[in-house]
A protein has these predicted regions:
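A common structural junction motif
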Residues: 27-29, 77-85
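Generic alpha-helical structural signal
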Residues: 21-25, 70, 83
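Glycine-rich beta-strand-turn "strand-cap" elements at beta-sheet edges
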Residues: 41-55, 81-112
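Short, surface-exposed, polar/charged, turn-prone segments marking secondary-structure boundaries
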Residues: 33-38, 59, 66-72, 86-91, ...
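Short amphipathic alpha-helical segments
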Residues: 15-42
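Residue-level signal for secondary-structure boundary sites
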Residues: 15-17, 67-69, 108
Length: 112
């Protein structure tokens, strides 16, 4: 069972898709290395196919529980190496497009 933090976002116009994903991966890899996240997945819209106006990239970050997610947020601020790659990634994001969602596996332990 996991909590899944999902972000939809586009990169800024002057940034390539590859640079966007490379910078994002540096940050997310740091969270995994520091045991603050289980894993992640980055996907890109295929052929522009979608039923609503969502940004092009989807980032799914999987956490054991809400405490691990909270710990990931804290290390982003407190660890200089993690903060550096976080800032490096954030400057590539088109902030007008970013959307955040929090999902969980269902049914979870509370629903069984």
């Amino acid at each position: 069972m996991a909590d899944i933090y999902t972000i939809y976002a586009d990169h800024k116009d002057n940034i390539s898709a590859k640079d966007f994903v490379d910078k994002m991966s540096l940050f997310l890899d740091k969270l995994v290395e520091n045991k603050k996240m289980l894993n992640y997945r980055i996907t890109r819209m295929k052929l522009g196919f979608r039923s609503m106006d969502l940004p092009e990239f989807r980032i799914d970050m999987e956490f054991e529980n809400m405490q691990q997610l909270d710990d990931a947020m804290k290390i982003t601020i407190s660890d200089k190496d993690v903060d550096k790659v976080h800032v490096g990634f954030n400057q590539y994001v088109d902030v007008d497009t970013i959307q955040h969602f929090l999902y969980r596996d269902y049914p979870d332990d509370q629903q069984k």
